[in-house]
Amino acid sequence: MEGVTQFFQQDAQLAELLLDYICHTLYADKTAAGEPVNILKVWEGPQFLSSFDRRQEGYARYEEQGLIRTVETIGPADHSNAESSMTEVTADILASYEEGEIDAIWCCYDLYARGVYAALKEVNQDIPMVSVDICNADIEKMAEEDSPWKACATTNWSYNGEFGMRVLALELAGEYDQILDPMTGQASNWLELPASLVTHEMVSAGGIDVSNLDTVAGTAYSDRSWMPTTGWMTELLGD
């Protein structure tokens, strides 16, 4: 949009981090043997939501490389109660597949993932699942012993608002050349915030929520090197 600065999560990267984890951690042997990992995909289809479409771009790259095969794509039948709807839809779909036909479940959105999680518990199937975005309810479910919910991909929530305020301050100061896209390092009015992977192992000890996620989520989650700044801002804020 001409003349308007926009910033987003790096949605394609969110999708790719999860698929990389599936292919190279959960199913490393299968991937090394050149076999695609069979994915039940939870997604809405094109043009439902722009962020979902950007996540699809990352997903599509793994399909194109032959690293994954989409067994089926599902989504909620009732958006007024999407979580419960996903539980029903997922349970019905799982009943139509034999054990081992689905290697993992990839979810474009954590609200839908909570419904998938409930379905896996309901039908007592041990299929690993991953999702985009994170909240305290997700962390609680991921932290359970033997949880099927293996990973979430997310940006650092505490940084997102600060990033927006720094960008606004730089615009008010007329320093547009200091507003850099974190993913490219180039001045831009289209800005994408980098993603991190949070795994079951990181939160399984308990006592973790989004307020202290930085204590277990690794250096990528806590990295601030891409935060926009300039001389006067560093003097005022310290970085």
Region roles according to the model:
Residues 43-53, 107-110:
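Extracytoplasmic "Venus flytrap"
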Residues 3, 38-41, 59-83:
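Short beta-strand elements in bilobed, periplasmic/extracellular small-molecule ligand-binding domains
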Residues 36, 42-43, 163-239:
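Hinge/cleft segment of the Venus flytrap/periplasmic-binding protein
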